[in-house]
A protein has these predicted regions:
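Generic structural signal for well-ordered, non-membrane alpha-helical segments
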Residues: 24, 28, 54, 58, ...
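Glycine-rich phosphate-binding segment of PLP-dependent enzymes
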Residues: 33, 69, 74-105, 110-128
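PLP-dependent aspartate aminotransferase-fold enzymes
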Residues: 114-185
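Hydrophobic alpha-helical segments, especially N-terminal targeting/anchoring helices
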Residues: 62-63
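Active-site-adjacent loop/helix segments that line or gate small-molecule/cofactor pockets in enzymes
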Residues: 3-57, 75
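Short clusters of hydrophobic/aromatic residues that line enzyme substrate/ligand-binding pockets
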Residues: 53, 79, 167-169
């Protein structure tokens, strides 16, 4: 991507919200102001006029006026938003023990063994992460260790996450986040 192309939209994110340019009602403008005050600049809003979502159910997201949007983008494509089994399992486990994997605990091993049972035998270990950023960072580290290489090819508007290494592979974060030295568009 040329420098001119990178500068053609805010933060290199096409269709991004630009403060003062969207057609937002006052209550949404107030939410934008709160976001700008409380959240870091990497938390960009999608769309020239951001959608004010209030809930999700299955494949649908709903805005404050009740309008439904088919979610083909967000982070829960495999089970949908607020799947009752996931909500119940999360509540059940949170009521018992909610911590990381650095302690002995049966549940994390039960889950790991059940998941690994679905994989070929040469995929015999797993590493759990909390976010896609962490998962992509780990995948990059594994790829580098396995191949000895460091190169990474991305598309112009790619988003892979916000860890230090992975942000450098995410041109959509904008010109304020330099691309990594081994990244090629």
């Amino acid at each position: 991507m040329t420098d001119t192309a990178r500068q053609s939209f805010p933060g290199n994110m096409p269709n991004a919200y630009q403060p003062g340019k969207g057609n937002l009602p006052p209550e949404d403008e107030a939410l934008v102001a709160r976001r700008q005050k409380a959240l870091g600049p990497a938390y960009r809003l999608f769309y020239e006029t951001p959608v004010h979502l209030v809930r999700g159910e299955g494949v649908w997201l709903y805005d404050k006026d009740g309008k439904a949007y088919l979610d083909t983008y967000n982070n829960v494509a495999s089970v949908g938003h607020c799947h009752p089994h996931v909500v119940a399992a999360t509540a059940r486990q949170a009521a018992v023990f909610a911590s990381h994997t650095r302690y002995l605990h049966d549940t994390v091993l039960d889950y790991a063994e059940a998941l690994l049972a679905h994989f070929p035998s040469d995929l015999s270990h797993l590493m759990m992460t909390c976010t896609g950023s962490e998962a992509n960072d780990l995948a990059y580290r594994i790829a580098c260790a396995h191949t000895g290489g460091t190169g990474f090819i991305v598309t112009d508007n790619a988003y892979h996450g916000v860890t230090h290494t992975i942000a450098g592979m995410s041109p959509s974060l904008g010109t304020g986040v330099a691309l990594g030295e081994h990244v090629r568009l």
